[in-house]
Each structure stands twice: as C-alpha cells, then as structure tokens.
C-alpha cells in the first residue's frame, strides 16, 4: 500500500513537470530540450539551499526562479541570437549540467537529515496534491487571459499574431520561462520527496512529460469539457502506474526507456488509427448514399 501511495505522490509531482512541458511542446510547438536540465536545476538549488540552512519554502521559490532564468536563456538564444529552437535547448541543457554540478559541488547530495517540505506534519501526498491543484488552477486562469490567448496564438499561427503588431519573441520567451519554472518546481519537490538530489535525475524528463501529455490528451480528446491540464495530470498517473506494474512483473529498471517508447507508440498509433477510420468512414458514407439513391 505504501508503494502505491509513493507512486501516486510521485505522479502528482511529475504532473507539474508535464504541465510545464505542455506549454512548450503543445502550445508553443517548441522542442525545448533544456527541460532535463531545468528539472535537475530545481533539485540542485533545493539541495544547496537546504544544506546551507535556508528555509524549504524559500529554497523552493529560488528553484522556480532559477528555472525561469533557464527558460529565459533558451529564449534569448533562439530569439535574439537566431539559434534554432532545438539547438538552443540542447545548448542550455549542456550548460545546465555543468552549472548543476557546480551548484551541488558533487554528483549526489542526501537530504534526509535536513528539514524540508515533505518531512513535516503534512502528509506528502496531500502536499503534492495541493501543489498540483495550485499550478493547474493558475495555469488555467493564465491561459484564459489575453496574454494566454496570445501565447496559444503564437503556437498556432505566429504570422497572424505578428501582423497584429505583437512581439512574438517576447511571448515565446515568456512561455519558456513559465514552462521551465514549472519543471524546476517539480524537480525541487521530487528531490525533497525522495530525500536526495542527483545530477543525473533529470535524464528522460522531457520524454516522460511528452508521454504524459500524449496519453492524457489521446484518452480525453473526445471529452471537450475536460481541460488539457486535467488530462495531462491523469496521463501522468497512467504512465507512472504502467511503469510501476511493469516493474512489479519483474522488468528491470534498465527497461524503463523501452517501456516508455512502447507506451507512447501504443497511444499514438491508437489515436492515428481512429483518425484514419473516421476519414475512411467519411468517404464511404456519401458513396453508400449514392448507391441507395440509384437503387
């Protein structure tokens, strides 16, 4: 039972990261490879702060701020220096690896003996749920504002937004900052929940986030009343429990990437198959009606 609760808590924390990836991957259509580094940066900042006697709350806020800064750098490289979006993310990811290692001073820092958010009186799963709820509500509210609609517009049709006299570069940078801030928040919470920070803990973060997005949106795309943010949170749960049950059946931790790839392929293939069937049916219906009229 404790194992399931632990997986649920981790799913909640990782869903915050998935919400951050959603902004760049789904809204901005920006392949931000720096997500792995931003996630680890959140953990690194918290580890450094806690070991130096800084409050867990302040440490978590610092992690968010540093994540936003990472997004800002990615945006500047792409917008101001005209470096491609993919390469900008890769460059920042590489820089963050060295920066995170420099921040921590070593590759791994245990946090069990330090006071942090998850070893207080509040239950870890309740605290994680509170963070997810706040992030989801704030993101939903933001996306309903004029700035939020502009952010969506930049991803859908940047030329139209540009024709309105809006600086699309600034909007992209803002989106990257929010995205990486959420990802760093997730990393900081995960480090506190697990009780350690590791320089390699962010590897695969982007893939995990994309998997949660694909699973959630594929499952709930027919239900228009369900928001994407809700679908992504559920997708994160489904993905994490898929991994959990696969590990319970005896699969090795080295098989995680294989499992992830299979899960993503399965949901993508299912979604594409449904689209193909709809198109085929749409073509067949008029022909059937014509035959009936002839008869």
From Swiss-Prot:
Species annotation: Clostridioides difficile (strain R20291)
Topology class, membrane: Multi-pass membrane protein
Subunit field text: The complex is probably composed of two ATP-binding proteins (CDR20291_0806), two transmembrane proteins (CDR20291_0807) and a solute-binding protein (CDR20291_0805).
GO MF, one annotated term: transmembrane transporter activity
Subcellular location: Cell membrane
One annotated Gene Ontology cellular component of this protein: plasma membrane
Source taxonomy: Bacteria, Bacillati, Bacillota, Clostridia, Peptostreptococcales
Cross-referenced InterPro entries: ABC_transp_permease (IPR001851)
Keywords: Amino-acid transport, Cell membrane, Membrane, Transmembrane, Transmembrane helix, Transport
Main location: membrane
Name of the protein in its database record: Tyrosine transport system permease protein
Record field: transmembrane: 3-23, 57-77, 81-101, 122-142, 173-193, 200-220, 232-252, 256-276
Record family assignment: Belongs to the binding-protein-dependent transport system permease family.
Function statement: Probably part of an ABC transporter complex involved in tyrosine uptake. May also import phenylalanine. Probably responsible for the translocation of the substrate across the membrane.
């Amino acid at each position: 039972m404790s194992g399931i609760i632990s997986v649920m808590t981790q799913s909640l924390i990782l869903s915050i990261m998935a919400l951050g990836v959603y902004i760049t991957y789904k809204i901005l259509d920006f392949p931000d490879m720096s997500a792995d580094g931003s996630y680890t940066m959140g953990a690194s900042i918290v580890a450094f702060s806690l070991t130096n006697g800084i409050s867990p709350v302040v440490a978590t806020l610092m992690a968010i701020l540093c994540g936003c800064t990472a997004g800002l750098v990615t945006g500047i490289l792409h917008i101001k220096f005209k470096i491609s979006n993919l390469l900008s993310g890769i460059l920042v990811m590489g820089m963050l690896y060295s920066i995170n290692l420099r921040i921590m001073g070593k590759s791994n820092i245990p946090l069990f003996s330090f006071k942090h958010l998850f070893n207080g009186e509040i239950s870890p799963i309740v605290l994680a749920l509170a963070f997810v709820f706040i992030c989801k509500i704030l993101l939903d509210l933001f996306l309903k504002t004029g700035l939020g609609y502009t952010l969506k517009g930049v991803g859908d049709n940047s030329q139209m937004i540009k024709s309105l006299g809006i600086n699309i570069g600034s909007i992209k940078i803002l989106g990257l900052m929010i995205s990486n801030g959420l990802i760093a928040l997730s990393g900081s919470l995960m480090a506190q929940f697990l009780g350690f920070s590791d320089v390699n803990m962010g590897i695969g973060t982007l893939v995990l986030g994309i998997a949660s997005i694909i699973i959630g949106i594929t499952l709930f795309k027919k239900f228009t009343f369900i928001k994407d943010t809700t679908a992504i949170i559920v997708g994160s749960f489904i993905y994490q429990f898929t991994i959990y049950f696969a590990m319970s059946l005896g699969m090795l931790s080295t098989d995680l990437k294989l499992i992830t790839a299979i899960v993503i392929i399965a949901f993508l293939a299912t979604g594409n198959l449904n689209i193909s069937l709809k198109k085929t049916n749409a073509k067949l219906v008029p022909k059937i009606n014509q035959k009936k009229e002839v008869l």
